[in-house]
Amino acid sequence: MFACQHEAVVPDFLVLAKGLTGGYLPMAATLTTEAVYDGFLGDFSELRAFFYGHSYTANPLGCAAALASLEVFREEKVLERVASMVPVLTQELAQLRLLPCVREVRQVGMMVGIEVGAADGTGFDWRERIGGKVCLAAREYGLLTRPIQDVVVFMPPLCVSGDEIRFGLEAIGRAVEAVCG
């Protein structure tokens, strides 16, 4: 479920937000190891308590929405569904890798970064904002996405179908060809 699990990393802190409530209410949580938690455990007089909080934590309505969202996540077997869509995404990305201006395609699960560069293998001048131009062109083909410099981000919702994956990647491919030649 978390990126750190794909890398076999056990963090001391894990910060969660946005998706906890399925996007319905603001909610955030900070998870820690038992050792970190114990470091803050104590009476007020010991000055060990972690005095911190904000409107995105411990809100009863947000907590209820988060629990309901997690229940739907389990009931609808979202992780199992995602596991069946990852191979579809991986297979469809093969076509993008063939484009001369696609330098690299990086994928972890359903998260993809498509780096664009000149056909000769060099990068573009960052001031040209080619990634942004590709994303603007993708709108013409029906896809809203965003760049991180010259990397086009493709992160479909976890309820995506194979046809929708193909549609999105086709739009990116057409946009890359339109902008980069």
Protein language model regions, located:
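Conserved N-terminal phosphate-binding loop of PLP-dependent enzymes in the Aspartate aminotransferase
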Residues: 1-181
